[in-house]
Amino acid sequence: MQQSPFSTVSGAQAADQGHGKVTFTGSIIDAPCSITPQSIDQTVDLGQISKEALLSGGKSTPRNFSIGLENCSFGSPATKNKVQVTFTGMESAAKNGLLGITGTAKGASVAITQADGQIIKLGVPTKEQVLQDGNNTLSFAAYLQGDGDSTNVVTEGEFQAVTDFTLAYN
């Protein structure tokens, strides 16, 4: 008996031609806006920075990042349509309110700024930003800053700094 080209092959006889798994994760929050998935866990590359640029409190070039809010709904009249962001993390050894770095590099801190360039101190809420129904973008920047005067030693090496953010709607 000849097999038709349209006959099916049982699962036991079929070759594995690829397989995988898709896992869906997330959380439900009590807020007027959802946070975009890209905003929840970000990496901002500050680049390879010359230690000379950091002497006497010098700064690297700011790198932009944002927190995306989507599907915002505030009702009518609008309530809780203003948001403040608080960044937290390990403070710099210089105790300057900036984010401390870990790794082999020393003598510098990460500064986080609002879109207008104003430094955001760790643990201090940003000024309120008014939101619209729909999608919104909260814009920030970060740069590496030397920790002190010309006597402060900046040591080259790799570094990392981690901050968490919290949103508070008003």
What kind of region is each of these model predictions?
Residues 2-170:
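Mature extracellular/passenger domains of Gram-negative fimbrial/pilin and adhesin proteins
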